[in-house]
């Protein structure tokens, strides 16, 4: 018995011969995965920023200390609402925390649709505004905390942290937490810029 093999030659198309079709498909998958990974990391950073912003606002808003001694006319007490700077801090950081909570759905949209430019562009603009507000509140409060710890001999402002230790610890912790939120916002903006970058 003779075994004959029949071979059929099919000519390659021009796109297969040049290798364009497989390269385009691979690059799209890599870009989508890359942007989706950025979007997931963005969502995690937003959750961390919510925690630090709300912790800063809560720590500052509950900072209150009354000294155990008093006179007939005076009771020695320190509270965040004694200083307008600390009041601004609580309001500004609460606004930033509220914005971060409201930005979570847009971050989820960026995960589901990693190629969508609109939500990412909106987030980068609003993140920059929130970063500015957060930095202003943190810097203003940091100046007052510095005076509370060290005073100012030129103006005869005395340091109060020797007497109001718990108060100073709370407001210092609130300022540190607000600057951690600032650092997270910087990472969020850089991530959004990478996600919007076109190859």
Swiss-Prot record:
| A GO cellular component annotation in the UniProt record | plasma membrane
Q: Which InterPro entries match?
A: CASP/CASPL, CASP_dom, CASPL
Topological domain (Extracellular) residues are 59-87, 142-173
Q: Which Pfam families match?
A: CASP_dom (PF04535)
Compartments (UniProt record): Cell membrane
Subunit structure, per the record?
Answer: Homodimer and heterodimers.
Designated name of the protein: Casparian strip membrane protein 1
Source organism phylogeny: Eukaryota, Viridiplantae, Streptophyta, Embryophyta, Tracheophyta
């Amino acid at each position: 018995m003779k075994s004959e093999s029949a071979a059929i030659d099919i000519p390659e198309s021009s796109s297969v011969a040049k290798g364009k079709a497989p390269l385009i498909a691979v690059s799209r998958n890599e870009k989508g995965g890359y942007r989706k990974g950025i979007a997931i990391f963005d969502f995690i950073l937003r959750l961390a920023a919510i925690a630090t912003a709300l912790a800063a606002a809560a720590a500052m808003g509950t900072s209150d200390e009354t000294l155990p001694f008093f006179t007939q006319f005076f009771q020695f007490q320190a509270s965040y609402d004694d200083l307008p700077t600390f009041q601004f801090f609580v309001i500004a950081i609460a606004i930033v925390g509220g914005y971060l909570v409201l930005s979570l759905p847009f971050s989820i949209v960026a995960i589901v649709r990693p190629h969508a430019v609109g939500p990412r562009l909106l987030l980068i603009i609003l993140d920059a505004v929130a970063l500015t507000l957060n930095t202003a509140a943190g810097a203003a409060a940091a100046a007052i905390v510095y005076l509370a710890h060290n005073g100012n001999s030129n103006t005869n402002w005395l340091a109060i942290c020797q007497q109001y230790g718990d108060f100073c610890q709370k407001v210092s912790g609130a300022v540190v937490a607000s600057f951690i939120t600032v650092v997270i916002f910087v990472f969020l903006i850089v991530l959004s810029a990478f996600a919007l970058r076109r190859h």
